[in-house]
Amino acid sequence: MTMEFSNPPDAEIRAILARPSTVAVVGCSDSPARDSLRIAKLLKSRGFRVIPVNPQLEAGALRDVLGEDCYPDLASIPGPVEIVDVFRRPEFVPDIVEDAIAKGARVLWCQLGVIHLEAARRANQAGMTVVMDRCPAIEYARLF
């Protein structure tokens, strides 16, 4: 049985992007050449508090760039996270969803090419808004 998935309507995506909040960028790289860091910097420039999540980076690796420590996982982040932006391969998404649910996140945003229907269903069942296979930079350009 295949699950149908539709991203939220444009008005809802616009509302997510128009209201700066705390976003955890899972899979954030410290390389300026990587999309994950470029998107993290864009979100920061739009007023979001951006928390990098990458177990392979030192805590202070992105402090100068994003103003926040890097954490190995969502559970390690002190305080609430509203949006979880995923820059990991699809097979990692189910575990990220479980961590996001435990953290109380309200939005799961999976980047271009990151699609996992069962994880999206689980996130929706937990009350999360799910955006998949979309990039915030492209959505900003398209909706604002």
Which role fits each region the language model picked out?
Residues 1-19:
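Short N-terminal or domain-adjacent regulatory/targeting segments
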Residues 46-48, 103-108, 126-128:
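A short helix->loop->beta-strand "cap" motif at the edges of active sites that frequently abuts
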Residues 112-140:
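Rossmann-fold NAD(P)-binding glycine/threonine-rich loop
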Residues 92-111:
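Rossmann-fold NAD(P) dinucleotide-binding segment
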